[in-house]
A protein has these predicted regions:
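Short amphipathic helix-loop junctions that connect adjacent transmembrane helices
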Residues: 32-46, 220-237
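Structural signature of the two symmetry-related core transmembrane helices
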Residues: 77-91, 170, 267-282
């Protein structure tokens, strides 16, 4: 790919973010509806956990292949292919039942998201100037899709039925083809020989722990926790709580990106990880204290800090691995986050019925805090 100007990088990043914003709702709404209505899809709760983890787990082996496809075929082709797979998968949720049929759709979406995610990270960091600002604005655009999708999906499911939600979301994904077509067509080179999963550095350890705790335990437990405390109108309450997570990303991600540009993305990532771990600890403490105020304080703290963290990994990776090493480093970081986020739902399904929530969320808090502190001692190359 020819070197982009700052304006071209801004425009390409914006289009890639719009593509992902239109495609994400079909996936995110599953995290709301599958745990609450497994019987509609002929599923058991363990099968729900498997399906919610499958799209992450397939990227463990698929991310490096998708990164090579992106590097050789370019953002436009990769994202057009991914949008097509997304549309098929989302419409499939309208028609199909049974764990094996749905598993195929989840694997298809997992690889599609890999391409969309690499495009967003790579284009945001394609020009060294203003990477944090560009990534923050992109995260804000991306988060708007799931925010509106969760709110609309909860209302549709309540009054029109669960299956109708995915028919609408499949239609919503179709305009993403237009924005994908406007992405740069030229491919970008990639450093050869990088293994799909190598020995993790400090950034990869942090990515794993963030995926395991914030994307796994916290997100999967969010709908269940809110529904347990709000039995009346559970789907609307859970949908609103999950939408708040993405709504705050719309507001806070651009602010976080600009803040990271001024103060240093690595420093802000460490500080935000520590405060997010405090929020997880509060969620666990609410189980002991019995106070709803403690629960909501923990949920809000974790949601806010997760939004702050979202745009920060890409500029930290770009700082640590400059030049052509950036793409494989981004793929490795995303792979380790997916490993954590894939194992998180599986662990949650086993831990919550057997172990007190205070212990589960306390362990999550310790993992995230430790991974954040480990970044203090690591240095850019």
């Amino acid at each position: 790919m020819a070197a982009l100007t700052v304006a071209e990088a801004d425009r390409a990043t914006r289009h890639a973010a719009l593509v992902l914003a239109l495609c994400l709702p079909g996936d995110i709404v599953l995290y709301l509806l599958l745990p609450l209505f497994p019987e509609i899809f002929d599923l058991t709760l363990p099968e729900v956990g498997l399906l919610l983890a499958a799209n992450r787990l397939v990227r463990i082996v698929g991310y490096q292949w998708v990164a090579r496809l992106y590097a050789t075929s370019g953002p436009r082709f990769t994202c057009l292919l991914a949008v097509g797979a997304t549309i098929i998968a989302t419409f499939g949720y309208t028609l199909l039942s049974d764990v094996w049929a749905l598993l195929v759709l989840r694997l298809m979406w997992g690889l599609a998201f890999a391409g969309l995610n690499i495009a967003n990270h790579a284009l945001a960091s394609s020009v060294a100037v203003d990477v944090s600002r560009r990534a923050g604005r992109a995260r804000g655009i991306i988060a708007a899709g799931p925010t509106l999708g969760l709110l609309a999906g909860a209302l549709l499911a309540e009054f029109a039925g669960v299956r109708s939600v995915f028919l609408v979301l499949g239609l919503v994904a179709i305009p993403a083809l237009f924005f994908a077509w406007r992405l740069p067509a030229e491919p970008e080179g990639i450093a050869a020989g990088a293994p799909a999963v190598s020995w993790p550095n400090a950034l990869n350890v942090w990515a794993f722990c963030a995926g395991f705790t914030l994307d796994g335990i916290f997100i999967v437990g969010l709908a269940i926790t809110v529904a347990a405390h709000q039995p009346e109108g559970a789907i609307l309450a859970a949908g609103a709580a999950m939408a708040l997570r993405f709504g705050l990303e719309v507001v806070l991600s651009p602010v976080s990106g600009a803040w990271g540009e001024r103060t240093g993305a690595r420093r802000l990532l460490v500080a935000s990880s520590l405060v997010a771990s405090f929020g997880l600890a509060l969620v666990g403490l609410a189980d002991i204290s019995g106070y709803d105020a403690v629960l909501w304080a923990g949920l809000l703290t974790t949601i806010v800090l997760r939004a702050v963290l979202q745009p920060l990994p890409a500029p930290v990776v770009a700082e640590t691995f400059p030049g052509p090493a950036r793409l494989p480093a981004l793929a490795a970081q995303s792979t380790w986050r997916d490993i954590g986020a894939g194992l998180g739902p599986l662990a949650t399904g086993f831990l919550l019925p057997l172990v007190a929530p205070a212990a589960t969320y306390g362990l999550a808090a310790l993992l995230l805090a430790g991974a954040g502190l480990a970044l203090v001692g690591s240095r850019p190359r």
